[in-house]
A protein has these predicted regions:
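A short C-terminal helix-loop "cap" of Rossmann-like NAD(P)-dependent dehydrogenase/epimerase domains
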Residues: 49, 167-170, 194-205
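Glycine/proline-rich active-site loop of Rossmann-fold NAD(P)-dependent oxidoreductases
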Residues: 154, 179-192, 199-201, 205-206, ...
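Conserved mid-core alpha-helix of short-chain dehydrogenase/reductase
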Residues: 65, 106-109, 215, 220-223, ...
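N-terminal Rossmann-like NAD(P)+-binding domain of SDR-like oxidoreductases, especially those catalyzing
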Residues: 1-179
């Protein structure tokens, strides 16, 4: 089984590549990553010599680069590649629109042309907006993104569903809550809080500080992604969480 992982040098992508190579001895992984500010190639240093792992530097929003990497016979694509930092999306939405929407479109177009057997799109629960206190979202909930980042991911989700319905692309969408774990980008909340606390710096408070979030350990999410890779229903959307804010 040959799997293309986009954004595999990022936090969740790198953890998933390591998980998949360890869990499945019959899987070959191609890591396709632009290596932006959030990438951490060192997170994959321990598997770089694995004969079942290869790396290709490229941009998912570049049609020619995507077309080239799709020339090998792929069994699945898992799209982790994304601009994900909410504050950065507020400062400048343009990179988020390019990568998260146009990049996803390039991948879907290639999947359509090559009749890819499986396309997993890694989305986020932020496409739903803010839930009322004590309530959670189902997969049928209305999308109500509240930031340029969330809006770009919601648009990408709609594209994935449209390609599944219109062209028969065997696509699945996973919407996960916040992850934490090894190799997480230091600007993210938990690493930032820990670093600031260790250095006796102030801890950032967002809004009134009373928000509740569901946090999921990244290796548990990797297990869920691997499960979806094997068993998810084409065209389906799955929420993934720990279920414990």
């Amino acid at each position: 089984m040959k799997v293309l992982v986009t954004g595999g040098a990022g936090f969740i992508g790198s953890n998933f590549i390591r998980y998949l190579l360890q869990a499945r001895g019959d899987v070959e992984v191609v890591n396709f990553d632009k290596l932006t500010y959030a990438a951490n190639p060192e997170s994959l240093a321990d598997i770089s010599a694995n004969p079942r792992y290869s790396f290709v530097q490229g941009d998912i929003a570049d049609p020619s680069a995507v077309s080239q990497v799709f020339q090998s016979e792929l069994d699945a694509v898992i799209n982790f590649a994304a601009e994900t930092h909410v504050d950065r999306s507020i400062e400048d939405p343009s990179p988020f629109l390019r990568t998260n929407i146009l990049g996803t479109h390039c991948l879907l177009d290639a999947a359509k042309k090559t009749r890819l057997p499986r396309f997993l799109h890694i989305s986020t629960d932020e496409v739903y907006g803010s839930a009322p206190a004590g309530r959670s979202f189902t997969e049928e909930a209305h999308l109500d993104p509240r930031s340029p980042y969330a809006a770009s991911k919601a648009a990408a989700d709609h594209l994935v569903s449209a390609y599944a319905n219109t062209y028969g692309v065997s696509a699945v969408i996973l919407r996960c809550t916040n992850n934490y774990g090894p190799y997480q980008f230091p600007e993210k909340l938990i690493p930032l809080m820990i670093a600031n606390a260790r250095e006796d710096k102030s801890l950032p408070i967002y809004g009134d500080g009373l928000q509740e979030r569901d946090w999921l350990f990244v290796e548990d999410y990797c297990f869920a992604i691997a499960l979806a890779l094997e068993h998810a229903k084409p065209g389906a959307i799955y929420n993934v969480s720990a279920g414990a804010p």
